[in-house]
């Protein structure tokens, strides 16, 4: 599977609106997990995959989710890989945000004990 550009689907770990959608999608998924599990393994896998399809529809919109998942079979590993890709994107965005603010602080924060590399104040 090709790497997914989650930014194209509105994933922005620095946006409150994104986190509102993400938290709502997770909450909805948690409610679905309370449902009784099917008896057959094949049906459990289908439910697992369908739960993720609904999660992505809640997160990125139904049309985007259909586009993203149209060729994905009901295979647990495939959906695990897609979710791992989403989490990697969020992690990378948060790490970049932390690097950016650290760089800003290093460059512009007044020199204080423990921050000798900061720019001098005027």
What are these model-derived regions, one by one?
Residues 14, 18-25, 48, 52, ...:
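Alpha-helical structural motif
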Residues 66-122:
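C-terminal charged interaction modules
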